[in-house]
Swiss-Prot record:
Keywords: Cell membrane, Membrane, NAD, Quinone, Translocase, Transport. GO terms for molecular function: NAD binding; NADH:ubiquinone reductase (non-electrogenic) activity; quinone binding. Its EC number is 7.1.1.-. This is NADH-quinone oxidoreductase subunit D. Belongs to the complex I 49 kDa subunit family. The lineage of its organism: Bacteria, Bacillati, Actinomycetota, Actinomycetes, Mycobacteriales. Transmembrane segments: none annotated.
Amino acid sequence: MTDTETVLVAGGQDWNEIVEAARGADPGERIVVNMGPQHPSTHGVLRLILEIEGETVTEARCGIGYLHTGIEKNLEYRYWTQGVTFVTRMDYLSPFFNETAYCLGVEKLLGITDEIPERVNVIRVMMMELNRISSHLVALATGGMELGAMTPMFVGFRAREIILSLFESITGLRMNSAYIRPGGVAQDLPPDGPTEIAKAIADLRQPLREMGDLLNENAIWKARTQDVGYLDLAGCMALGITGPILRSTGLPHDLRKSEPYCGYENYEFDVITADGCDAYGRYMIRVKEMWESIKIVEQCLDRLRPGPTMIEDRKLAWPADLKVGPDGMGNSPEHIAKIMGSSMEALIHHFKLVTEGIRVPAGQVYVAVESPRGELGVHMVSDGGTRPYRVHYRDPSFTNLQAVAAMSEGGMVADLITAVASIDPVMGGVDR
């Protein structure tokens, strides 16, 4: 082999034909185009550097970093409890998963995982599954819009509005609520919370059926998604791909089953898989997972029992029954009485908890949850102080974007849109 000889090693799709064509192609026939970072089909500020020959993508590379927020670095300067407010803003379409993963890590470092009240775990599971539905609705709605199916977009966003309104009534915010806290949740469900949740689930059934009726057997939709964005099991394992992309290869990998957390082992649900390794299989997985999430939420409502929503150790956890005063300003008299009405020591503990934060024993842990996009992991390091020494997130969108080249090179430019939509990346989680 000479120094000038080019060696290309690749696999999947029609790579052999691509290599043969590349050897005899005139370099002048190829052009490099930038798709994004401002483009309606890249799911945010994702830049795709494409080398194309006619309508064929010969090389695809991702350019990221346009939404960098420095959240992981900011966590090193905030108390452990304050960190929830930051992490909820990373993958902004599934904030409850960011919060839960963070809190599970803090609780594991504190050694209080087994002390979390049952009601807290039920509420966490319920909020995560509602969030899974809302996230999948955005994936299907935007994916349909990018391929020219406008009606599913309207159906999906109207259905998502039901869930966001529910989040607002429970947490006070539609998104990024910082509701999950180390040791519990910020506050209990409102008195009519279970009734509102049951009504929301009932209202979601019709739009979910309508979404399936529009696309499941739609000939145009199937032509645009079947055998497009192909990535088999070997490719997924080599790249560390998880979530619906991995399950579209037929492997039933779901952390809720393989490594249960928050009591998921107590719920009955199926891990949805497909065997096409393509965009259509990922679409069907998301459709069916929404119905499985509804099953889980219904079981949560059955398991919901009265009880505390925060661990009882007031040296570790803020009170979870914060109420605003009758004038709309400050804390309510009941809340103030609970903080300082028992003893001066109780007031001192509360003051130190708010002004200094909790001290977490030195150590490091890794905790992962099954987000709508795959394995969302947190590597958390404590030096024994009141702030994290380091918190690193393994965001599935970042990992899954590695598959863009394998899914799209050798295919048409139009199929690249399908491949990216089937990955469903959220750039807030990619760049952090």
